[in-house]
């Protein structure tokens, strides 16, 4: 499974992990010194959200910040004719509403 939000497109980003030593100036020291910088990845907080649309259960992988958007899509879909479609097709139709 990819680590990408299906609604917002949030994906892992590259950040730096900075190792420091010393005592902060505000605590009476001479200041923090950087002893090493290495790359690390920050992942979005992806959650699986299952909803029922047109009698079908559909699973979305979305960032936690976009979970309400899934339920908003389900509300908007109530006017659409989705009966007889596969879950994959229903999901495509819902994502078109964005």
UniProtKB/Swiss-Prot annotation:
Pfam families per record: Ribosomal_L28
Superkingdom of origin organism: Bacteria
Keyword Ribonucleoprotein (UniProt): yes
Record-level Gene Ontology MF annotations: structural constituent of ribosome
Family in the record: Belongs to the bacterial ribosomal protein bL28 family.
Alphabetical list of HAMAP family matching this protein: Ribosomal_bL28
Protein's name in the database: Large ribosomal subunit protein bL28
Species for this entry: Thermus thermophilus (strain ATCC BAA-163 / DSM 7039 / HB27)
Phylogenetic classification of the source organism: Bacteria, Thermotogati, Deinococcota, Deinococci, Thermales
Gene transcribed to yield this protein: rpmB
